Swiss-Prot record:
Function text: Chemotactic activity for resting CD4, CD8 T-cells and eosinophils. Binds to CCR3 and CCR10 and induces calcium mobilization in a dose-dependent manner.
Gene: CCL28
Alphabetical GO biological process terms: antimicrobial humoral immune response mediated by antimicrobial peptide; cell chemotaxis; cellular response to lipopolysaccharide; chemotaxis; inflammatory response; negative regulation of leukocyte tethering or rolling; neutrophil chemotaxis; positive regulation of cell-matrix adhesion
Annotated GO CC locations: extracellular exosome; extracellular region; extracellular space
Region (Disordered): 92-127
Protein name: C-C motif chemokine 28
Amino acid sequence: MQQRGLAIVALAVCAALHASEAILPIASSCCTEVSHHISRRLLERVNMCRIQRADGDCDLAAVILHVKRRRICVSPHNHTVKQWMKVQAAKKNGKGNVCHRKKHHGKRNSNRAHQGKHETYGHKTPY
């Protein structure tokens, strides 16, 4: 009889954990700080970029630049980055966005009782 009770409790715990996964946020890779300075020389080596919005999934607006195997988070208000994005858009003849918006993989808990661990990609550039 005790084994049957333990099995029922274990099953209930598994069901509760499975249901709570839909409520808890999926850990995302948001920038937690941004660099306000970036060199034009570094911008020449950018492979791709993404735009991170401060929309509830991430707390900070940023432009994420991918340089080799690094991600560099830069302020979207940075004048040098804005100019670079205009030049890149002109090179593409205005077709499509230079930097794509970051895709979100789920909704966050509205009361933010549990927050996923954010990865820090905010690098201060030595340039």
